[in-house]
Every structure is written in C-alpha cells, then in structure tokens.
Amino acid sequence: MLLGEMRRWGVAREMVDELLPNAARAIEWIEQFGDADGDGYVEYTRGTDRGLANQGWKDSWDGIRYADGRVAEAPIALCEVQAYTYGAYLATAHFAFEVGDTVTYDRFRAKATQLKAAFNRDFWLEEKGWFAVGLDADKRPIDSLTSNIGHCLWTGIVDEDKAQRVAEKLVSPAMFSGWGIRTLSKDSGGYNPISYHCGSVWPHDTAIVASGLARYGYDGAAQKLIFGLLDAAQAQGGRLPELFSGLDRGELTVPVGYPTSCSPQAWAAASPLLCLRTLLRLDPWIPYGKTWLSPNLPEGISYLKVAGIPLAGSRVTVEVGSDVPGGVVVTGLPKEIELIREPRRPSTAV
C-alpha cells in the first residue's frame, strides 16, 4: 500500500523501484502464510505463550472484544487487515500494469475483487449496521462497534450500499467524543475511556476515519472529525499526542490525557497532513497522468493555501477561497498531468 501510494504521487521513483522486490516478498507471505486456514483472509495468532496476543495496530491484550465485553482469542482476521490487503492487491496490480505484465495485473485485480465481495458478505452485520471488527477462530463475527471499520472506508473495500450506515455509526455520540473517534463504542461492553484501545481516542485513527468518510462522499462527517482534532490540538499546546481519553467533550473543557501517551509521536504528528489532504480532496494518480482535486472548505474557513505539495517531481501550490479566481487555483502541476476537478469515487478504476 505504501509503495503504491508513493507511486501514485510520483515521488521517490528510484526508492520505490528498489523496494518493489521486498513488496513482492510481502505479497508472497500474505498468500503463503498470512492465510493459515485457506479461507481467503489474513489472520494472526502467536506461536508461543509469549509475544503479542493481538497483532493489529490495537495490540493490547484486551484490544479486540465482542460487544458484550468478552476478549476475543486468536486466531483473528481483523477487518482493517483485510482492507489493507485489498489495497496491497490493487497496488500490486497497478505496478504490474506499468511494466506490461497483464497476467499479474489480471490476477491481483481478480484477487482484490474476490476479497472485497467476501469481506462485504462475511464481516457485515446487517442487524447492527456496521462491520465486525474481526472474525474469530470459529469464523464468528466479533461484533463490537470500533474505529477499525473506518479504515475499511479509507481503502475502498466497503460496498457503497453499506457506506452510509457505517458513516452514521462512526459519527454517532457513541463513537465521536467531540474531540475524535473512540477506539471502542461507549455502548460496548469493556468500554473504558482511559484505556489504551477500548475507548480512547487516537489522532491518527480519527484522521484515517475522516479520510475514509470523505472518500465515500460524507464530507460533512469528515469535517466534523477534523475540526474535533484541530480543537484537541489547540487545547494541548498545538500538539496532538499519541492518544487521549474518550471522555465526552461536554463533560470537560479540554481532552483528558492518557498517562503514558507519547508526545510528540509520529502517527499523531502526521495526522494533520492527512486531514489537510482530506479537505482538499486530493487524489493523485501520476502514472496514469491524472490528479483529482475538489476542495471543500468547511464553514468558518474562507481561504486556504497549501504550498510545496510534492507531485510528479514538482512542487504544487493550491489556493482555495471565495476570492480566488474560479474558487481554486493550482500552480506548479506538470502540464502532462490532467487535473480533474471532482472527487474520485472509491469505485473509480484507472
């Protein structure tokens, strides 16, 4: 996914080319070892009684729970891991297309299509209106409402007919604290707003969810999360920490810190950049000679200028505002790149 994103932006081409063999080995691992039981999903489990019981980004021992509060036991197929795998398959297909390898392109496009269909069938909880955070060892859905499902919007694996219900759940009072997205719904068993992964707010997680919401056209919901994060940063000296508590904003005037949170922390420091991209609705596909750009400024922001955006070996500046000619002015974009002034939908194939 990372190398595919770098290629889409047209940056560090030599570095990406150098790392492609490593990416190919990672794909081999997914195909040969990641899916231990052959059900089409990447699972994790530990081979000894030591090490991490949970091996997704929520790696605390109690980070994956059923809605009734029970802690799920491995092997577990996490929803966001399938979403990342979907993204990796698509990136592999596009790299193959670049070099004229139509066999590999067709194979990984097909794998991505199959994974998406299976995911929307097996992880979807129709009666609840959200995706399970994972499947347990018996392939039963782990049915708690979590922030993980926002990562699925982010990669585009979610069928569009399910996206609205997912979006509504993510920005509901049970999930949105006013500062950011809780890792676990406050209506779920095991919820603790001052836990590591069972009700706290992680800025990078919220930024990814906001990006996913915008990808499916829910710009108002995305902006709501982004403004929550910006307010949280302002209340904490302009710096977003690794995480903070999931207590409701209405209860206290500032976010309550997590006792051992890292600050600064790389994930959190990068979050405002993703939020900025989300507001710009910027989606470059440089290898195909296209860049989608459709800024949608929220109420209260009348002008925005972003300079130095690295695209296709150039540095691009975007100005947005009511006093800007045409509402948007882009400078520095190479002439061979077509600028498409609309958001790219998740189903758009290039």
Task: List the predicted regions and their residue ranges.
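Aromatic-rich carbohydrate-recognition surfaces in CAZymes
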Residues: 1-64, 79-82, 86, 142, ...
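Short, flexible helix-adjacent loops and helix caps
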Residues: 8-11, 35, 94-101, 124, ...
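Extended, well-ordered alpha-helical scaffold segments
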Residues: 12-31, 84, 88, 92, ...
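Extended glycan-interaction surfaces of carbohydrate-active proteins
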Residues: 36-77, 114-201, 234-257, 273, ...
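Residue-level signal for cytosolic alpha-helical hairpin/rod architecture
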Residues: 89-90, 149, 206-207
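Short hydrophobic alpha-helical module
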Residues: 95, 212-219, 232-236, 278, ...
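Beta-rich accessory regions
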Residues: 95-110, 114-122, 126, 214-224, ...
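Catalytic cores of secreted or luminal carbohydrate-active enzymes
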Residues: 261-305
